[in-house]
Amino acid sequence: MAAMQMDPELAKCLFFEGATVVILNMPKGTEFGIDYNSWEVGPKFRGVKMIPPGIHFLHYSAVDKANLQELDQFLGPYPYATLKKWISLTSFISEATVERLQPESRQICAFSDVLPVLAMKHTKDRVGQNLPQCGTECKSYQEGLARLPEMKPRAGTEIRFSELPTQMFPAGATPAEITRHSMDLSYALEMVLGRQFPGSPQDVLGELQFAFVCFLLGNVYEAFEHWKRLLNLLCRSEAAMVKHHALYVNLISILYHQLGEIPADFFVDIVSQDNFLTSTLQVFFSSACSTAVDATLRKKAEKFQAHLTKKFRWDFAAEPEDCAPVVVELPEGTSTG
């Protein structure tokens, strides 16, 4: 950097009031700049001082291949030993999938940036919501939960997952239809595929992988919950397996690689001791091994079931819970006569 002429008083003021950016180990010859100024740095360069208050733009560039060689000693190589595993976990995630799902902020955080739905900064606000005063003692755990403010994600920070239906049957369905659609979720799945993935149902697998990776590497709990809900929808859609057999062949491959990344007891509910995954896959295998299903899918499902039984000692031989009598809550006003 060339020496600059500056008023001594201004220089003294900026020395104490201005900012300093420290940049260590920048290779000689690198082009470095701040705002409209840029330089090719020498061996003694360590940063910039006396930066005036305000917004600034720092930029740098390796000007040629020779300089890239100098940078080599400061760079860690990509661990290619894990590349195959990474590809297997992201094989259906396209650029369009990332653009559609990633937060508008383009940052994925383990803990959501949340705001209270209602500010309730003052006692009168709490009274308006029929909430007890903060100083009073909680009489139960549920009361304690009720006192917590309702929160919502800060706009632009949430992962934009597809909205999954909570009602699995069409409006106006008869009691018999409600029961059928509650046991076979194909109607709900087709609604998701038609609205979110028109013309390309395989893209739902990209969203399944995106959710899993966000949980596995980013520790995003909301992504794990979405992965479970989406997987449940896919595994409990018997009619859809016949229609979208190629999608389900690929689903088995995806699950094979995903389940290799987590402990066998990870999905066990600590309260009920029920294993979400075994119960969900039990229904899936029961449907996928049907004679009505494509032979390729059926054969792959049988091999996958045998693999999981051997590796995790999961029992899929027992009768699925879905074969037991199912109690279905009918919408208000639905007649059973």
From Swiss-Prot:
It holds the Pfam family AAR2. GO terms for biological process: spliceosomal tri-snRNP complex assembly. Keywords: Acetylation, mRNA processing, mRNA splicing, Spliceosome. GO terms for cellular component: spliceosomal complex. The modification N-acetylalanine is found at residue 2. PANTHER family: A1 CISTRON SPLICING FACTOR AAR2-RELATED, PROTEIN AAR2 HOMOLOG. Interacts with PRPF8 (via RNase H homology domain). Component of a U5 snRNP complex that contains PRPF8. Belongs to the AAR2 family. Component of the U5 snRNP complex that is required for spliceosome assembly and for pre-mRNA splicing. This is Protein AAR2 homolog. The gene is AAR2.
